A protein has these predicted regions:
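Nucleotide-activated donor-binding/catalytic signature segment of Leloir-type glycosyltransferases, i.e.
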Residues: 70-99
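Conserved acidic donor-binding segment of nucleotide-sugar-dependent glycosyltransferases
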Residues: 151-153, 157-164, 173-178
């Protein structure tokens, strides 16, 4: 077994509560339906009732459009996202960031009050690892290998993927509890530095290939 090694940019930098945008959420991608953007919008609608100033920052271009022809050409899921945004009056609560490189992604992690990963399907998402190694407090759906990356209520929050009210609850818990943010940040960084240690992962990968080569030679 070999853990993931992250892009080099994410091994430099550290999340700081005092410097983050309070009541902000960062989501690394949203236009693939399995990434759960629709659940994030449902949760955002709940959060906004208690935190009217909440902002969701997400990569990609805005789905909001008045162009009928454009709507017919794009994926149905994008039209569904637009419908939810307008239904819940979230137009001013979301910032679409366009396409970001690794350094720009890192900046968004560091500026976020909370990183959210509301995916329906995952393996071991690098986005969660990137947030953890930088120390950004994480709220993630409990899918795939995420529970092997992050211990619930010690290094972040895990929740049932199709329960946006739980996502909203845990995000607001971190908005309200600065000490919990500090605790998660410290513990997650410590765990991620081991999981994503580049030298250890390289050594493990070499051992795997060596083992395969030895079996072939036999």
């Amino acid at each position: 077994f070999c853990n993931e090694t992250l892009r080099p940019e994410f091994y430099v930098g550290e999340w700081n509560y005092e410097k983050c945008r309070k009541h902000s959420i960062f989501m690394s991608q949203g236009y693939n339906s399995i990434k759960g953007m629709h659940y994030m919008l449902e949760a955002l609608n709940i959060i906004k009732r208690f935190y009217p100033d909440v902002k969701l920052y997400v990569t990609g271009t805005s789905p909001l459009s008045r162009n009928w022809i454009e709507k017919q050409k794009r994926p149905v899921y994008v039209n569904y996202l637009e419908k939810l945004i307008r239904q819940y009056s979230l137009e001013n609560s979301i910032v679409f960031l366009g396409s970001l490189n690794a350094e720009e992604m890192k900046e968004q992690y560091l500026l976020a009050n909370v990183f959210a990963s509301p995916s329906s399907i995952e393996n071991s998402p690098n986005s969660v690892g990137e947030a953890m190694i930088l120390g950004t407090p994480v709220v993630s759906s409990d899918v795939g290998g995420v529970k092997n990356m992050l211990t619930h209520n010690e290094e972040g929050f895990l929740y049932q993927h199709d329960a946006p009210y739980m996502l909203a609850f845990y995000v607001m818990e971190l908005f309200e509890n600065k000490e919990k943010c500090f605790e998660f940040s410290k513990n997650a960084k410590q765990h991620a530095k081991t999981t994503h240690d580049a030298n250890q992962n390289l050594s493990a990968l070499i051992d795997i290939y060596r083992s395969i080569a030895q079996k072939i030679e036999r």
